[in-house]
Amino acid sequence: MKKIVLAVAVLLSLAACTEKSEQMKELAQMSLRQSLGNGQVKIIGISEPDSTFGTNYMRPDEKKAIIANMNRVTDVIMKRTKNMSVFNPEDSYTIALAERQMRANNDLRSMLYDSDTKGEWSGWKVKIDFEAKDGHNLDYRAERWFFLDKEGNVIFKTMEFPLP
């Protein structure tokens, strides 16, 4: 009898975790759609909620992936401008990509300098890769990180990095 009660308790806790995980992912998606406001968002992928230990804490593999993506974005900009020797002010795509990268650099610096110190558990993070249209109706790709409270009910910080 004890084994049956224990098995039911384990199954219920697994179901509750799965339900909470889905709720956090839905909250992040809703926040993304509302923040972009244009309704033309295509979700490419959503990570499972992961523990976070501060608002800038990233695991080493996450930092490495973000830096690699930012390097690829830089490569795209350099290729389109021939290493900045041929700048075309009419090239809206390159200008918009460079603007998104410059905005992301502040979060990147904070993440690199502050994320090595793993603090106390502060909640959850969810990453969404997506495609959307910017204010100039240009297609772009990005990843946005959502930092949620311990209960997974409130998003208290986001970071967005462009994707090439």
Regions found by a protein language model. Name each.
Residues 4-14:
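Sec-dependent N-terminal signal peptides
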Residues 17-164:
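Cystatin/cathelin-like cysteine-protease inhibitor module
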